[in-house]
Amino acid sequence: DPGAQWKPGEPLKLLLAGYNGTRNTGADVRVEEMIRQFRHLFGDEHVEMSIYTIDPEKTRGYFRTVRQLHIPKIFPRYLFDTVHTHHAVVACEGSMFKSKFASALSTMMVGSIGLAAAEQKLAIGYGGEAGDMDEGLRALVERYCREALILARNRESQEVLRELGIASRYGTDTAWTFTPAAPEVGAQLLRDAGWDGVTPVLALCPINP
């Protein structure tokens, strides 16, 4: 039983699988921008989106028009049941296939798009990376993501995916097109935290794929 299958004339039921519900700014901004893009492309009448959240309290008020699904800590059966009721899955975390962040997170995304592919549904990774993986995770990705398409955010990730036999296209992180708040908003937040308005502020975001 392949579960829900899209038919002409009905909304596309799209499931977003990422790292949301922890107040990770990058993860939330990335997904907010994906949602804006999908709503723009499809129109609200043609798409019904759902998203996993680790903690619904931390995503309250986020992701307008999207149904939030509280994913449990032990998630294999939950993934199966949820993917089964959707037409397509988009994995949407930057650290998509790598062990340096959390293999459990990657396993959840592999499971989601792997289940979608097994049911002959759209299985997409959007704006992610593939990097160093432990042996178990690498084998999982190689086996279950072969029918997926990954829109990678750098060339290095494409090379890793090519070695695993997984189709990819070169793109970028969706957060690049997110419209931020005005600079004055950020300046006020810094002042509220003790900034004097003059001292240079250094922001570091190191990552090694």
Region spans (language model):
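Active-site anion-handling motifs in enzyme catalytic cores
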Residues: 1-209
